[in-house]
């Protein structure tokens, strides 16, 4: 096939128990004020303001960080997407857990030759092979076959594209690039479900 991989780098936040702020069981729509275990007692706004994220809600923060060019990605900020929370920490010891309400965020990096293991997506460190490539994406309910998403997505400079999917479901997702395709099962039903998909090898 004609695809040429641009680069491949690992994801430092690839395990279900990866280091980062402790998940907060409260998802009432407000950010946690103060640090979680191990962090300094900094208010919510301090971390966000320090990284140019003040005034954004959780969804906007995720989409903003996902879309940054590689040069723009902060080296001193970790942002881990969990099924119900965005866990953030920085080099100053500030930690923050923001609730993700409504739809489930899944970030996907199709690949041809090389990939890396990942489970919970790291918005600032995860990199996939195919950057800024158009991908035909189809997501259907695994039980009924109902198509819930179909269209063209473009991978960001980090090689990933993100989808907001209905929470609580089981789906089949197909990705196609230049005639090469892959189909896999995905789930948005539990707190253990992956938010990072790096196993779709296009053939």
Regions found by a protein language model. Name each.
Residues 1-2:
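N-terminal export leaders
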Residues 7-10:
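C-terminal motif of bacterial Sec signal peptides marking the signal peptidase cleavage site
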Residues 13-54:
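N-terminal low-complexity, Pro/Thr-rich disordered segments
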Residues 96-98, 104-111, 190-203:
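Extracellular beta-sheet/turn segments enriched in Thr/Pro/Gly and aliphatic residues
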Residues 99-148:
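Mid-length scaffold segments of soluble, non-membrane domains
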Residues 144-158:
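Short, acidic Ser/Thr/Gly-rich low-complexity loop/linker segments typical of extracellular
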Residues 155-163, 169, 173:
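Glycine-centered loop-to-beta-strand initiation motif
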Residues 175-184:
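A short, solvent-exposed loop/turn motif at the edges and junctions
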């Amino acid at each position: 096939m004609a695809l040429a991989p641009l680069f491949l780098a690992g994801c430092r936040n690839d395990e279900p128990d990866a280091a980062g702020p402790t998940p907060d069981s409260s998802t009432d729509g407000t950010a946690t004020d103060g640090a979680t275990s191990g962090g300094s007692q900094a208010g919510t706004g301090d971390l966000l303001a320090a990284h140019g994220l003040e005034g954004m809600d959780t969804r906007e923060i995720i989409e903003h960080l996902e879309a940054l060019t590689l040069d723009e990605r902060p080296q001193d900020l970790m942002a881990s997407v969990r099924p119900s929370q965005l866990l953030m920490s920085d080099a100053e010891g500030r930690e923050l857990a923001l609730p993700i309400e409504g739809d489930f965020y899944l970030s996907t990096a199709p690949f041809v030759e090389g990939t890396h293991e990942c489970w919970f997506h790291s918005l600032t460190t995860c990199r996939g092979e195919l950057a800024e490539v158009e991908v035909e994406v189809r997501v259907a309910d695994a039980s009924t076959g109902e198509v819930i998403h179909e269209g063209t997505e473009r991978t960001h400079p980090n090689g990933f594209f993100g989808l907001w999917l209905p929470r609580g479901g089981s789906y089949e997702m197909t990705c196609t690039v230049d005639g090469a395709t892959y189909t896999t099962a995905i789930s948005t039903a539990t707190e253990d479900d992956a938010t990072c998909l790096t196993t779709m090898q296009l053939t």
